[in-house]
Amino acid sequence: VIGSNGINMINLRTEWTGGPKSTNGAYGFYPVESEDVLIDGCVAIGASDAGIYVGQSKNIIVRNSIAQYNVAGIEIENSYYADVYNNLASHNTAGILVFDLPDLPQQGGHHIRVFDNKSIDNDTDNFAPEGNIVGEVPRGTGIIVMANSDVEIFDNLMSGNGTVTVSYTHLRAHETKA
């Protein structure tokens, strides 16, 4: 869904049934460049980028949803005013990502709240296609925040992630020179 206002994705399911593969589709749910986005009670399994992805959007709620066996369970990217709560992110490479990346139509992600989620046992090997930025995310990640401002993370249950519980970083750590 691109460039829409008032998107409601409620009680939907996307799943790649052949297990984690780089040839799986990139996204389970993918609203971008949109306003007033609601993802509620959805299930995303097996995406080679993000199970639940919201990008370059504003006024977002992702709640009561399940993301499993994706590279990134839930990803909020280059977005404004998002609440991500009461979700389960498990057995992904990384549970929840809050990124702001260059060269996208909307820059300066801000005012993101991640709370009352379970980001547990994110232990799936990274199977993103080569060249994807999420291909750099280490297996066993609970939450990564990169290059955003005014991000609040509170009252989440995180366990069994193995590599990192919560990481705050800036983009330069991930840039490479040609």
Predicted regions and their residues:
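Right-handed parallel beta-helix
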Residues: 5-18, 35-50, 58-72, 80-94, ...
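Short glycine/acidic-rich loop motifs that flank beta-strands on beta-rich extracellular proteins
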Residues: 1-2, 18-27, 48-55, 71-78, ...
